[in-house]
């Protein structure tokens, strides 16, 4: 119980170190951009990803015959889920996780093309956005680890993250109006910061929810909701951008919206 906040923070920190490292490598490799170079980088990344995952999964979870014996009584998934979903605040926790994840994830496929199409950033410059985003999350982790260790409510931390996200997306929208890549990059940093607060806060809340009996099911539900919300957000973000852009191009939204930024905003 005492080390749980540090475990969650360490989990995300290692994830972000990988994101920052890969983003810097991609930015360097794509500095002299070409389609052949892009194909080579993608192929190499696929091979490296496969090898790293094999190494990472090797002997990750030891066998526990005392917990996996067939003679042990196991509740059905249906009964376990009914016990979980009837817990106080369970539905609210999952809804908050899903909506918050969608709000932050819809930017995933939009920030890089936004920087390139609206602000004229290079391929290397847009690739660096991943490192900038991850840097904001690392900054959030440094604050979260200390706050959670002092007993701060993880839901409060997640709520503060949402507020930072609202402010950050406002800066991203404003950057197009003033044509400022610096303001855009500041918005990306704050998006990462807010996302870090929200994601770690919600994961910590899920780990604390339901006690030891429901720990596995709670984390499974957390992962399922997050993955589903992320998939819906990525699809809807791209679809909304394309739809609004097409309306703007034909003048359905007025002359003010006939710009490359219309679909993103």
Tell me what each language-model feature is:
Residues 1, 197-211:
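Intracellular juxtamembrane helix-capping segments at the cytosolic ends
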Residues 5-30, 223-237:
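Glycine-rich segments within core transmembrane alpha-helices of 12-TM secondary carriers
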Residues 28-47, 239-265:
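A membrane-interface helix-boundary motif in multi-pass transporters
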Residues 46-65:
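C-terminal membrane-cytosol helix-exit motif in multi-pass small-molecule transporters
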Residues 109-126:
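Short amphipathic helix-loop junctions that connect adjacent transmembrane helices
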Residues 163-179:
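C-terminal ends and interior cores of transmembrane alpha-helices
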